[in-house]
C-alpha cells in the first residue's frame, strides 16, 4: 500500500470517516487507515469504546446513532467545521435472527432495513456534499466505501431478512455509482463472506455464545476483521483513477455462501 498517496501529486494527509468504528470491521478499518497515514474520525454509538480506540491509535471520534437523523446532521456539522473530508467508509450494519420467511418478525426486518439500508442512505446524503466541497477545492478525488456482504448476492434458508437488507444496500451503492458518474468520486463495495468478529454473529443469535461458536467450528481460518480492513485500505490507496466497483472476499474454506469446508484444508494426491 502507498500510505497517504493517491493521484494528488504527492503525499498529503487525507481524512476519512469510518462508521461502525467501535468494534469488528469498523475498528479494524480505523486501525488500518491510521497505520497508513490517514486522519480518521470513528463514528459509533458507544462513546467509551471510541475513546479507547482514539487513545490507542490517535484517531478522533464522534458518538452518533445513524438511525437518528439528528445525530447524522450533528456529525455532518462537526465535520464541516473541522476540516476537509476525503472518504466515507460505511461499515455500520447488522443482522438479527435466523427466522424463515414465514416465521420472520416484522420488528427484526424493520431493524435490519434501518441499520443496513436507511442508515447508508442517511450518512451518504449528509456527507456527500462535504466530499464534493473537498474535491471542488482541489482535493483530487473523494471516496465512498461500503461494507455489504455476500448475503447480498446469494440467499440462504434463515437469511431472508438479512439477504434482503444487504441486497438493498448493495443496490443503493450501485445506483450511487451511476449517479456520481462524471465526478471525481469513487464508489467501492466490499462484500465479505464468513468473517469471525467478536459481536456480529453473537448479536444475530441473541447473545447465544455457544451457538455463535458452532458456526465457526472446524473452519480453517475464517476471515477476520483485519482482512477486510486491508482490502479497504488497498482500495483507498489505489491510484485515483482506479475504482474497485465490487470486491467479493471469502475465506478459502468457503467456496460459496452455502458451501463451507469444515476441517483441515488438505491437498488432493496428484495420483487421485
Whereabouts are the PLM-identified features?
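Conserved glycine-rich cofactor-binding loop
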Residues: 22-23
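Conserved glycine-rich Rossmann-like NAD(P)H-binding loop of the short-chain dehydrogenase/reductase
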Residues: 36-51
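Substrate-binding pocket helix/loop in short-chain dehydrogenase/reductase
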Residues: 99-101, 105-111
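Active-site helix of classical SDR
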Residues: 124, 165-168
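Residue(s) in the substrate-gating loop at a strand-loop-helix junction
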Residues: 149
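Active-site-adjacent segment of SDR/Rossmann-fold oxidoreductases
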Residues: 154, 175-185
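C-terminal helical subdomain
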Residues: 189-190, 209-258, 262
Amino acid at each position: 500500500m502507498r500510505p497517504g498517496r493517491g493521484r494528488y501529486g504527492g503525499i498529503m494527509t487525507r481524512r476519512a470517516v469510518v462508521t461502525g468504528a467501535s468494534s469488528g470491521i469498523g475498528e479494524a478499518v480505523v486501525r488500518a487507515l491510521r497505520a497508513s497515514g490517514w486522519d480518521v474520525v470513528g463514528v459509533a454509538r458507544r462513546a467509551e469504546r471510541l475513546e479507547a480506540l482514539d487513545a490507542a491509535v490517535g484517531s478522533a471520534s464522534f458518538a452518533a446513532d445513524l438511525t437518528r437523523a439528528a445525530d447524522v446532521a450533528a456529525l455532518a456539522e462537526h465535520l464541516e467545521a473541522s476540516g476537509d473530508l476525503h472518504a466515507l467508509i460505511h461499515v455500520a450494519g447488522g443482522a438479527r435472527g435466523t427466522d424463515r420467511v414465514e416465521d420472520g418478525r416484522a420488528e427484526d426486518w424493520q431493524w435490519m432495513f434501518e441499520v443496513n439500508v436507511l442508515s447508508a442512505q442517511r450518512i451518504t446524503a449528509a456527507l456527500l456534499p462535504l466530499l464534493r466541497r473537498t474535491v471542488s477545492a482541489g482535493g483530487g478525488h473523494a471516496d465512498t466505501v461500503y461494507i455489504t456482504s455476500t448475503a447480498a448476492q446469494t440467499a440462504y434458508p434463515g437469511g431472508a431478512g438479512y439477504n434482503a437488507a444487504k441486497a438493498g444496500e448493495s443496490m443503493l451503492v450501485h445506483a450511487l455509482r451511476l449517479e456520481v458518474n462524471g465526478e471525481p468520486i469513487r464508489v467501492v463495495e466490499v462484500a465479505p463472506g464468513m468473517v469471525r468478529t467478536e459481536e456480529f454473529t453473537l448479536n444475530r443469535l441473541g447473545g447465544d455464545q455457544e451457538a455463535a461458536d458452532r458456526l465457526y467450528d472446524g473452519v480453517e481460518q475464517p476471515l477476520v476483521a483485519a482482512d477486510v480492513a486491508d482490502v479497504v485500505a488497498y482500495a483507498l490507496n489505489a491510484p485515483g483513477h482506479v475504482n474497485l466497483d465490487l470486491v467479493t472476499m471469502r475465506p478459502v474454506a468457503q467456496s460459496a455462501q452455502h458451501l463451507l469446508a469444515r476441517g483441515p484444508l488438505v491437498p488432493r494426491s496428484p495420483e487421485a
